[in-house]
């Protein structure tokens, strides 16, 4: 299947080690570039099915269809955010910056005087690999959505 990597694969380490590491990962890989990703090496580029800055896509869990935005960075406004489209992002780790971002989204939900978010919950998930529920392991969309329900 497809494996979506939301950036900063090459944050540390030598280029040869990075190429060897990514080459051993299973699945067809899509890299959503982060601020620490150097994709100038042709050998590295060839390891990915696609390399992009931002991706809009759909996924299905059973009979449920999900509309998604994949970005390395957390963003405050994404297409159809008030119509159920879910943002998956990384970059912020488990930082004060991420807590501030999530607080801002909560304020947007609570103070929605235009009722933009009324029909669907505004959802953005930090899927950084260092998060407890990610544990440096690829996760399915279902696992990501269920992890938030447990919190």
Task: Tell where the protein language model's regions lie, with residue ranges.
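Short, motif-level signal for alpha-helix interfacial/capping segments enriched in acidic residues
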Residues: 64-82
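Active-site neighborhood of phospho(di)ester-bond hydrolases with catalytic His/Asp-centered motifs
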Residues: 3-8, 29-35, 70-71, 87-93, ...
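A short, conserved beta-to-alpha structural element at the edge of catalytic cores
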Residues: 27-44, 118, 123-148
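Beta-strand-turn-beta hairpins that frame and shape the catalytic cleft
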Residues: 58-68, 120-123
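N-terminal active-site segment of His-dependent metallophosphoesterases
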Residues: 1-17, 121-132, 146-151
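Flexible, gly/pro- and Lys/Arg-enriched active-site loops
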Residues: 52-56, 96-129
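Core catalytic region of metal-dependent phosphoesterases/phosphodiesterases
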Residues: 1-56
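Active-site environment of divalent metal-dependent phosphoester hydrolases
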Residues: 10-16, 35-42, 76-81, 88-100, ...
């Amino acid at each position: 299947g497809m494996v979506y990597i939301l950036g900063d694969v090459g944050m540390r380490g030598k280029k040869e080690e990075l190429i060897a590491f990514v080459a051993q990962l299973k699945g067809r890989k899509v890299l959503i570039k982060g601020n620490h990703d150097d994709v100038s090496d042709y050998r590295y580029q060839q390891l990915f099915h696609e390399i992009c800055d931002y991706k809009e896509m759909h996924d299905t869990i059973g009979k449920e269809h999900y509309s998604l935005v994949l970005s390395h960075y957390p963003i405050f406004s994404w297409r159809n955010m008030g119509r159920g489209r879910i943002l998956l992002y990384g970059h912020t780790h488990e930082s004060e910056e991420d807590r501030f971002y999530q607080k801002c989204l909560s304020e947007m939900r609570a103070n929605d005087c235009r009722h933009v978010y009324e029909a669907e919950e505004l959802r953005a998930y930090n899927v950084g690999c260092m998060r407890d529920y990610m544990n440096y392991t690829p996760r399915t969309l279902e696992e990501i959505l269920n992890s938030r329900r447990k919190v």
